[in-house]
């Protein structure tokens, strides 16, 4: 998951609402499995609806659209990377620091040397990938203590993927800027190659812990948003004001596959039926973003990133205490997560975004 705050069409869209929906879908789907809250509902229409719109896929789709828009409107690649960095890293730094501190005070972290650990921590922050930090430095975790062998997060891999999207996209868009048709073809070919790679992982049942957290096997989802933004002037009529049509199509397909193995959309397997359903979901997301826009409904309070960052820390804390399977966890988990997300927004994310706005304005005034 990667947060975005640039909006096309003068901010007249529902992307903030959709990111919040995606974050909540991820939180509730994890509560369903990890806290065993959904066990009585497995195989029901509630299961089919919840898992028919995977939040991670929605994040990637929205990110493809908005990050492409951000790059196109940026004065330079450096400006683009500064904006992205100020949106991603401040909240990520605090989130990882909180988790590491929680592990340290509960016996799950063994700091054998300050410099060695600082190197590890730096790699962890810059990549959002604990597995990469461990590989390039050392293993500081005891796999014991309050949290046991569990990673208090476990969701940051999507940010690692998102960061590789940010590194890949400028190269593709520079080709598109110079040669429109060739650039679009390159994006499409890259998307096809990404889908083939994901299919290879699925068919061979092989999981590469390093390649799997890059743009490689998931760029095909991100590219749907990229191509939609590049050709929005041509395709917008397919989506704007067509929310009911796209929703009806999505629900009809969900009903058709209900009760089968295809009811659960997996972005990791990328089977043809999953790819088709994600393409339909992309249409639904783009239509929902540009139908009946309510840009001020959230009053410019974007909690989606914080919910994504902290929901698993709250969940693993509940599991470590021994609270699983209780109906009231449907309340405790979201309330605890939203409280932390609100703090993250007010104390970290919003000030960082104001700094970003100030830096961009200062650069424009100098220019």
Swiss-Prot record:
Location in or out of the cell: Cell membrane
Gene Ontology BP annotations: lipopolysaccharide biosynthetic process
SS bond partners: none
Membrane-related topology note: Multi-pass membrane protein
Superkingdom in the source lineage: Bacteria
Record-given protein name: Nodulation protein 10
InterPro entries named in the record: Acyl_transf_3_dom (IPR002656), Acyltransferase_3 (IPR050879)
One of the record's GO cellular component terms: plasma membrane
Family according to the record: Belongs to the acyltransferase 3 family.
Transmembrane feature ranges: 15-37, 46-66, 88-108, 109-129, 155-175, 183-203, 208-228, 245-265, 270-290, 312-332, 335-355
Remarks, miscellaneous: NodX probably forms part of a complex with membrane proteins specified by other genes in the nodABCIJX operon.
Pfam families assigned to the protein according to its UniProt record, in alphabetical order: Acyl_transf_3
GO molecular-function terms, A-Z: acyltransferase activity, transferring groups other than amino-acyl groups
Keywords tagged on the record: Acyltransferase, Cell membrane, Membrane, Nodulation, Plasmid, Transferase, Transmembrane, Transmembrane helix
Function: Not known. NodX allows Rhizobium leguminosarum biovar viciae strain TOM to nodulate Afghanistan peas.
Keyword Transmembrane on entry: yes
